A protein has these predicted regions:
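Helix-loop-helix junctions that connect adjacent transmembrane segments
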Residues: 5-6, 123-127, 156, 160-305
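Loop-to-transmembrane helix boundary motifs in multi-pass membrane proteins
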Residues: 11, 87, 127-134, 223-244, ...
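Membrane-interface "cap" regions at the ends of multi-pass membrane proteins
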Residues: 1-45, 58-62, 70-74, 83, ...
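Small/aliphatic-rich secondary-structure junction motif
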Residues: 488-547, 563-565, 569-572, 624, ...
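Membrane-interface loop-to-helix entry segments
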Residues: 129-179, 192, 233-237, 379-393, ...
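A generic transmembrane alpha-helix motif of multi-pass inner-membrane proteins
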Residues: 376, 380-386, 420-477
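C-terminal membrane-solvent junction of multi-pass transporters and transport-like membrane proteins
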Residues: 154, 343-355, 390-445
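Glycine-rich, Arg-bearing micro-motifs that act as flexible, cationic patches
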Residues: 599-623, 638
Length: 638
């Protein structure tokens, strides 16, 4: 096997780990701020709250797995809502997601200086934490405009280091400070915490699962979504549960709740400006608080402080960057569906990045949130958007199952568990998850006036703008899906930036990939090499087929990628299971809003009986594609 082929096979094996690492880097980073924010409300019941929120997260992860496998496109709950309901519901879900990303950027950037305060103490207090947080946001926006890309290998390394560090703290904590007696004494039911604070802490704990949307956003780059996405989500869930079901017990054992002057206090929930028992509060750097209260030697504690300060700030920086990328991607997608003006799709002439979307939603608005300097507000505003969009996602999956029962759609993957009643496979995970997130949303709206006005105001402003834009500018119904037109014409005839190339085991495919690379190379375009596995009607779409079909499909995509490497063009491989190859090609091109499909076809002898000129699949694509189609006919045999 050639060196190139060995390297490509290694990269293919790293598909699921890379997807897991990126998702865990976003979800796992939230432990560095969620622990302190939740403790403000839950006090001694913080571990119980994380368990309850974890069960809701498990249901939500199952929902996102099924929806993303079915519709492997960026958008998450917005995409699910578009297919299950209509464009108006999709917009509201997307607008709530936008709030999630904005809050993620603000809260992650704000907590970076607090962990770096191990090097300079003023960073943990105003105004330096706000100033440094704003600098982080500005730097991330500039880096994303220039187009700096993350390395999958670095993400894997950081995810492993992050998980190993958190696991080490858990093990040390259980050995040195864990005490069931202390944990029991921490709780005064109905008093510390009060019932209202306890119920409010559950939606706030959703902050701990920041980044589940990342899986959906990365699905477009996953080679085989049906296989890699469920595995990656499962690994993320296991890793997250392992930490969130253990570290809070250690934290409350190390920093117990005390009754002082009529108030119940724990260092874990106090802001850094307040002091208790000779220490400042650790609300804004809770994991550092765990390190400082494990009872380790001064030298070992100091080493751990420095190591954790560097690691946590790096993970939070990457988490904030994921928010910036997510905000720009969802803005770009919303513009593509005419939910926002096309100006947000404007690409920088030099760097080819959506710079307006990055500046507005990745920079300006997060900076406004950061100026508040209130971690409780930042956490609650994220919980508002998250519970709303999660509830829409659960409802969309339930709706899809009902459509499937009526024969409207075919679902390639079903998450567990399900209950079949009257011909419908009701998704129990979506039902229970929807109840959990829906009730959590109501709790936030009812109990927190500031979030009620800010969150509902955000949704209302977005809705009013959407109505105005749709009726006065687009002149389209609110519920109709409208795609942005693809720029076609003499001036841009050869400026193809998104090319779909179906590949099969014929030399015509090699000619098609070669032609596509020549079209894309001048404009830094990307190519989607698509291979369709046609599944017989008597088998489910996720059935394993005989004859090493999947291995052959992966080999095809490796060959296409090798051709792209020779041209310096990024080739993204995608395996799709479908009943008909032609329909799958058309759907994939429309989903990605591709500008052209390049297909290889054999030359046919026209002296025989009449039939399709290039073959049934090519003719179907020519008749039904929403974009241009170019056919690369193979040269005649000598």
């Amino acid at each position: 096997m050639s060196r190139r082929r060995r390297q490509q096979r290694l990269e293919r094996v790293l598909g699921t780990p890379a997807l897991f690492a990126t998702a865990y880097g976003n979800v796992g980073s939230s432990i560095y701020y969620a622990l302190g924010v939740v403790a403000v409300y839950a006090l001694g019941l913080t571990p119980v709250v994380f368990i309850i929120a974890g069960l809701i997260f498990a249901c939500t992860a199952a929902t996102y797995t099924e929806g993303t496998v079915h519709y492997p496109e960026a958008g998450g709950s917005s995409s699910f809502a578009r297919h299950a309901f209509n464009e108006l519901v999709s917009f509201e879900a997307a607008w709530a997601q936008m709030l999630n990303y904005i809050a993620t950027i603000a809260v992650s950037a704000f907590f970076v200086p607090h962990y770096l305060s191990v090097f300079w103490a003023p960073l943990r207090q105003n105004p330096w934490d706000i100033v440094f947080g704003i600098v982080v946001i500005v730097l991330l926006v500039l880096l994303n405009i220039v187009g700096i890309q993350e390395s999958a290998r670095i993400n894997v390394f950081l995810a492993v280091a992050d998980f190993a560090t958190q696991l080490l703290l858990v093990l040390l904590g259980f050995i040195l400070v864990f005490s069931p007696a202390v944990l029991k004494a921490n709780v005064q039911l109905g008093v510390a915490p009060t019932w209202s604070s306890f119920f409010l802490s559950i939606p706030i704990a959703m902050l701990a699962y920041t980044g589940i949307e990342t899986v959906s956003n990365l699905s477009e780059e996953a080679r085989d979504p049906l296989r890699t996405i469920p595995r990656a989500v499962l690994f993320v869930a296991i890793a997250v549960f392992a930490i969130y079901f253990t570290l809070p017990w250690v934290a409350l054992s190390a920093m117990p709740v005390h009754h002082v002057a009529g108030e119940y206090k724990t260092l874990l929930a106090l802001p850094p400006t307040e002091h208790f028992q000779g220490q400042h509060g650790y609300q804004n750097d809770p994991v550092l608080g765990v390190v400082n209260n494990l009872g380790l030697s001064h030298a070992f504690t100091h080493v751990l402080q420095i190591y954790l300060g560097i690691l946590a700030s790096t993970i939070l920086f990457i988490g904030a960057n994921a928010g910036v990328i997510g905000a720009s991607r969802i803005t770009y997608a919303m513009s593509g569906y005419r939910q926002l003006p096309l100006g947000f799709r404007k690409i920088h002439p030099r760097f080819k990045t959506p710079w307006i979307a990055l500046v507005v939603f990745g920079g300006a608005i997060p900076i406004l949130l950061t100026l508040s300097g209130q971690t409780k507000f930042l956490g609650a505003i994220y919980a508002f958007g998250a519970t709303f969009s999660f509830t829409v996602a659960h409802a969309a999956i339930i709706r899809m199952r009902m459509q499937q029962a009526r024969g409207g759609i075919e679902i390639p993957y079903r998450s567990r568990f399900n209950l079949r009643v009257r011909g419908v496979d009701w998704p129990l995970f979506a039902i229970f998850g929807g109840l959990g997130t829906g009730l959590s949303f109501l709790v936030i709206v009812i109990q927190t006036p500031s979030i009620r006005y800010a969150g509902l105001g955000w949704l209302l402003v977005g809705f009013l703008f959407y109505v105005f834009y749709r009726r006065r500018v687009i002149h389209a119904p609110l519920t109709e899906t409208v795609r942005a037109p693809i720029a076609l014409g003499p001036a841009v005839a050869l400026e193809y930036r998104s090319v779909i190339v179906p590949v099969v085991w014929r030399r015509e495919s090699e000619a098609a990939v070669d032609l596509a690379c020549r079209l894309a190379v001048e404009r830094r375009g990307s190519i989607i090499a698509l291979t369709v596995i046609e599944v017989p009607l008597d088998l489910p779409l996720d059935a394993r087929l005989p004859g090493n079909v999947e291995d052959r499909a992966n080999d095809l995509l490796d060959e296409a990628r090798a051709i792209g490497d020779a041209y310096g063009v990024n080739v993204i491989g995608r395996i799709v299971r479908a009943r008909r190859a032609g329909r799958a090609i058309v759907d994939e091109a429309e989903r990605r809003n591709s500008e052209i499909i390049v297909m290889g076809a054999p030359r046919r002898d026209r002296s025989g009986p009449r039939g399709p000129i290039f073959g049934g699949t090519v003719d179907f694509v020519l008749k039904n594609a929403h974009c241009r189609v170019m056919v690369a006919a193979a040269p005649r045999a000598a």
